[in-house]
């Protein structure tokens, strides 16, 4: 297993404090076997100010959906997002383990705006999407550690949907 795969496996097993960021230069095969995200039929999407290919898969050993965001030439993993991560626990558990985030950004869950729901720990390469009112963490994003001012241009994804 690679260091990226090992780190994701430790995170999956419930240790948020063990996550210190996606290693710079991580390639898609480096995520195996912790993440199974086949390279076929990726979608293109905005990641910060960049365009990325998104591969959809699962966190190995679970039914948790995983997204692997890679550079357009698929050479480097920029971000791994995991939906409904039970290993994160409730929002208050995250705060107990990691303390207050460096950034609290507004995001949305579907069509519901959630002010301050994107908790960014840029020095850890971690963003936690929390609905404090419902006591639920609904997404985590894993990336290479950065300065707080770099997060929005490199890794930010606005998740809200518009009503028709």
Residues covered by each model-derived region:
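Short helix/turn-capping signatures at newly exposed starts of structured segments
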Residues: 1-117, 121-123, 131-164
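Terminal recognition/anchoring or ligand-binding modules at protein termini
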Residues: 128
């Amino acid at each position: 297993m690679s260091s990226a795969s090992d780190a994701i496996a430790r995170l999956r097993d419930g240790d948020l404090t063990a996550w210190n960021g996606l290693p710079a230069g991580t390639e898609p095969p480096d995520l195996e076997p912790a993440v199974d995200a086949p390279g076929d039929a990726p979608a293109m999407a905005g990641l910060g100010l960049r365009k990325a290919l998104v591969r959809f898969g699962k966190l190995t050993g679970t039914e948790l959906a995983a997204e692997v965001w890679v550079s357009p030439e698929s050479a480097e993993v920029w971000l791994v997002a995991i939906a409904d991560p039970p290993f994160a626990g409730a929002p208050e558990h995250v705060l107990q383990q990691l303390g207050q985030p460096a950034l609290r950004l507004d995001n949305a869950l579907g069509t519901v705006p959630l002010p301050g729901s994107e908790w960014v720990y840029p020095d850890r390469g971690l963003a936690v999407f929390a609905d404090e009112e419902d006591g639920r963490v609904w997404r985590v994003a894993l990336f290479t550690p950065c300065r707080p001012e770099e997060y929005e241009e490199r890794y930010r994804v606005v998740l809200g949907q518009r009503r028709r």
